[in-house]
Amino acid sequence: MERDVDADIRLGSELLSKYPLDINVAALIRNYTAGELFDNLRLFFGASPEDYNLQFEAIFGIYCNKLEWIHFLGTALGITSHVVRFPDAEKLSVGKIVFNVTIPRVAVPSGVPNTKNATAVVVKYTERMPIGISFELSFAALEKLRLSFQDATLLDKLINIQAINNTLQCINNSANALQRGLINVVLTKLLHKAPPFFILKYLEEPTGGISSNNSVNRSNAVFSIKSLLPQCLFILNRVENKTSILNILTEMTALVKHSIMVDSSLYTTSGGDEVSGVLVTTSNVLNVITNMFSKLIHKASVVAPVAYGEFIMSKENAVTALAHHAIIADFDQYVQNAQNLTAGPLKKSNFLEMGQDRSTISVQLMQIGDTLVALEQLDKVYRNTMTHNPLDNRLELTFHTVIGLHLPKSISYSTMDAKVSLNSTIRNNVPTSIYFYDKDFTLQKVEFTDCLRTLCHPIFNDGQVCARIFTREIKDGERLCDGHQYVLDNDPPYPNEQHMRNFYGDAPPPMTTNQLKNEYQDLEFFKPSNKCLYTELHPMYDFSDVMIDEAVGQICTPRIMIGNMPQALAPSEFQEIRSMQILEISKNVYPQLYETTVGLATQTLNNPEYPEICYVISVLVHGNRDAFAAAHTLIVACINNAYTTKNMLPFIHDFDMVRLIANNMTDSRILSDAHMHYKRLWSLIGFLKKLVETGGLHGHLVDDPMLCYLNALFDKRLLPPIIHHFPAMKQDMNVKANNRPLNIRGAELRDYDVSNLERMINVGGHVVYRDDIIEAEDLTVSSKIYYYCMLPALTNNHMCGASLLLNQFIPDGFFNSDFIKPEALYAAEQTFEASVMLRRLLEQAGVSTARRPELHEIMTSFFRLLLRMPENARVLEITGPLDHAQRHCMPAFQAVHHSLYDGFLLVAPPLILAEYIQAIPFHKFYSDPVIAQACAPYIREFLTRYPQCNRTDGGFPTPPYFSREYFNWHRTPFFKYSDTCLNTVKSMMTLACMHTKFSPVSTYLQSRARIHPGFAVTLVRTDLFDVERILYSSKSSMSVIIGDPYVYKEKTDIHTTYHITQDISTVDMGMGYSAVTCPAYLRRIVSDMGATLQDLFKVFPVASFGNDELDEWIRTHTGGTHASLFDPNTIDILTFGQVNVNEQPGILIGQKAVVECVVTPVTAPLHYFKIPNNPRGRASCTLAIDPERKQDLFRVIYDHSIPDAQSFLSTANPWGSIWGSIGDVMYNEFHREQIGYNSRIYSPCKQFFSLDDITISNRTLFKITGEYNSRSKSCIDGDNETQYVCVEGTSDMVEKPCIIFQESYPLLSASSEGLLESHIKPPAVRMSETHFQNYLIEEVIPITQILKK
């Protein structure tokens, strides 16, 4: 009967069924549901409006329920889940379910203990996640829908067909949303219980299954996880090694645990093989896997359920019962209940037969090892929706490389000599550039010129913030460098004779921190045993604890020159290579022919029989051309005889004598060979001058020539150590002579034509007299080159400053009976007789005194010198500020150096003139204690008591008046080098190049000329990647508890809104971790992986050098952004921040990845940059300390007496890792707030330097390792209430591993383009290689190799 009525109704509406609809919604619903459901839905439209409004919600809920679950169970994702029905699921917010699990056991020999428990009670908790969707139907559409089936003509039905279409569209869209929502919930829950492969593999390792949560196990966990992460990252992009990919897929299937409840009859093939799990991924990854392993993949039909279980709880059943029922109760019964508004249990359905609760579905299967796995991609679920596919992730990786490292000779070998041939210059020069590839596989190059907007910024060149942080109160027990015992005296006493005796009568003073630093060589400097390491905060400044007013205080002073860096940070070998690099850039040729002259000069200056008469003549001539002409005969005799008989070059201890001999004796009687050597010495000065001019510009900047900013030898503020004529000096310079203020322009003029009795009286006094000569600037520069570069290199500091006591020597040498005779004898013999002392001096020079005519001529020439005699030497103290580019940090700083006015340099201990010479160790270049003790017995006694002080490397104590280590222009590293250098032109070049200044202008000039600036730079860049993950889940690893959908409506005058809600709860059914993920496929690189260097002028917009002209010059030449503190926009930047606007066309290059610079010593170990490491130079990952103990955390991170976790040094870069260092100041937000920065500018370094970020990362990692270590066992042998889900922070570890581990990855890069191109050519040798001074850093994650393919 019912069938007949149904047939009549079908017949009556036949025309409507055949009407061609624009959308195929009806067919779609019919395919997914039984035909009866569709017919009932159509029949229902003929009811009254009241019935429609009442019952539509119930009908739609049932309809969606059926579509939803049939669609889910028809996918391979259904393999992962039990589906259980629970009508009251909305009341189940948190549920606790207990399972009895049988424990498998192995029989053992008798007498061996074995477990007696056959079962274990496992507790699982439910997680509720309701899903919902809403849609609107207009009132007019509903009315049209009603009229279409009630008292309507056929024409009305045709006219209102659009109303039906709209309604069906809403119904279909909402049901489709619930289908997608269910799959999304299941996938999300599976991911929530699926740790990454690198974590799960560690937990399954033999050493990983230790639940003890001590520091050792946490460290082992992190080390293992960090090692495994690069291995599994982007594995499907490494198509060259299919075996490795298959091995990882096999490991993924083997790592997961089985389910507590597995129905072996479900999801089996026709051949009886059971599907063990499902590999869920995206369509891209599935295509890659299919193409790569097509032989292992086939399509097959498997048995799958088409019904869900029912969740039953009762007193009799305290555990869980699963009973299979039909997916949906009978439709008519449900409608009847809804109409009567009565609730009651549903009877068994006659809609579907109970026997048909299983069917077959077609799925892709892959044989991975001995495991059969189903393949599923879910892109179709998320396509064209606003919901993000949880298998698509954004990965953030930070990379590092280094530019400008120096490789010592011990490792300056080649591993690529057979593949790469570079010219000798490039091969052996310190590199000033780094090469790498961007995401388009285009070669990129970064040079020091690209880093200028960091290296020339005021913040980088400023030491005030570092000094402010370094200034502190000394705590009890604080570990201090021994240099803190050095007493800082701002006004030391002048070292007169009595003071000198007192000084050398006491014990030697404590060594300074600078001196102690230079006792360390190579990597010893970076070790915890270096107690001075904490004072190394900035390459351009010296920091030290010192004694001030009998208390420990702090001092910070500019280093002024590159040569003042500690030798461990800029070793002699590096300085020499740098000088050869400058020689190459200057296009000059190494003066090999000069080496003969240099050898002869070395032999002369190291000869203990150096003629002492040379000292007398050089002092009496004192650079005066007329005096030199008067002594012409005497000088010629000394040169010719000394050169002929002793193979020596007299007078080369004095610059002015060399100058006058080379330029004024070309047509004299001097031997041509000897004169050639003097001319070569003079030419060598010119050669060195040209060398250090390399990189300079013409013109002036703030009243100083550009060369003044480049090299200190051109700075008028630095005077030569020996002065005979005052040069033009800066007005802000202060000069003291013998500790008395001196006005050079107001000094008394010498008038040699007038007998000045007052000057004769003051020969040994303190009044300064001068010749009416202003020395030309180029002569002053040449003099500084000779005294600061050539003589130290020739003598290895074995010279000593001295004063000839003319007030004693002249009477004893000339005004005596041997020299002055009665007038009758002069008339008769026509000759001067030399005194005994003068005879000895002449004979020491090889001049014969036996022939009287010659002696008369010589002595006449000698006597004429007395007419232009100077005074005894005066000690000059020159103080003044530095140049404008160096003084912005400490404008009150006054650099100090000392010179001898009309003094000279002793080459060897004097024998004849010992009583007429006063040794003055005024400069560490010229303070040889062996020479000084010959003139001062109290120094000899001092050396006898303290033989360790007999040294010429700056370790010989000199009075505090001369030894002001932190204020002098030249400091200990200079003396260390010149003490041991070879006596060659190369050493002279090195000393000249060591005078290169530390300043932003100098850095710009050097970088522009491709000259190494004296320090390396670590480049740090963060890149973004779109990654597609693989999820593998074992069979039945989760139960999904569903409730009946319920619909409620909100009705207004114009439309009705329907809200459909489905309650879903999930229960993990795994014995342990039953699912695993792997970031397998690199889909695209979001950032450009390029070479866009950070502009610190945007980060710190108001920092200034304190001089408008200098600021403008620096910003203009470096390309820095101009900003003014008075600009309202600048105030807004400091207050609210401002996004860095990309001014270049973004369509060409995409999203830029910003590169930041961390200044680094050139001696930082290269191996540190070849492995994942913290770019600040010291590990920040501290697992032994609870991150909540902030004081302990701070100590472990910044206390460098504790070895670094990674390298077992204290640090690889003290300028970045020490609290208050320049790197810390620039990138640590704790300090940044003191200097005004733009908070909206992205900084890739911030995550490694900011203490807050470090603390958060450590807290997360500490929790992750602890939680996962506690889950290293299964639920049988571990805690029965442990829930095997991903712990909080796992997603951060997957998406931002560099932040969590506090490490960046090495970038494939090389200091030479040839090395890089050779490396990527097949067959590529996967290792980091070196080629003498050049190096190649291999990447740990083979991104470049992926891009290449």
Swiss-Prot record:
Origin: domain of life = Viruses
A UniProt-annotated Pfam family: Herpes_MCP
Keyword set for this entry? Capsid protein, Host nucleus, T=16 icosahedral capsid protein, Virion
- Where does the protein end up? Virion; Host nucleus
Q: Name one GO cellular component term.
A: host cell nucleus
InterPro entries, alphabetically? Answer: Herpes_MCP (IPR000912), Herpes_MCP_upper_sf (IPR023233)
* An example molecular function term from Gene Ontology annotations: structural molecule activity
Q: What does this protein do?
A: Self-assembles to form an icosahedral capsid with a T=16 symmetry, about 200 nm in diameter, and consisting of 150 hexons and 12 pentons (total of 162 capsomers). Hexons form the edges and faces of the capsid and are each composed of six MCP molecules. In contrast, one penton is found at each of the 12 vertices. Eleven of the pentons are MCP pentamers, while the last vertex is occupied by the portal complex.
Q: What does the subunit section of this Swiss-Prot or TrEMBL entry state?
A: Homomultimer. Makes the hexons and eleven out of twelve pentons. Interacts with triplex proteins 1/TRX1 and 2/TRX2; adjacent capsomers are linked together in groups of three by triplexes, heterotrimeric complexes composed of one molecule of TRX1 and two molecules of TRX2. Interacts with scaffold protein; this interaction allows efficient MCP transport to the host nucleus. Interacts with capsid vertex component 2/CVC2. Interacts with the small capsomere-interacting protein/SCP.
Q: Which family does it belong to?
A: Belongs to the herpesviridae major capsid protein family.
What is the name of this protein?
Major capsid protein
Per the UniProt record, the source organism is Elephantid herpesvirus 1 (isolate Asian elephant/Berlin/Kiba/1998) (EIHV-1)
Q: Which gene encodes it?
A: MCP
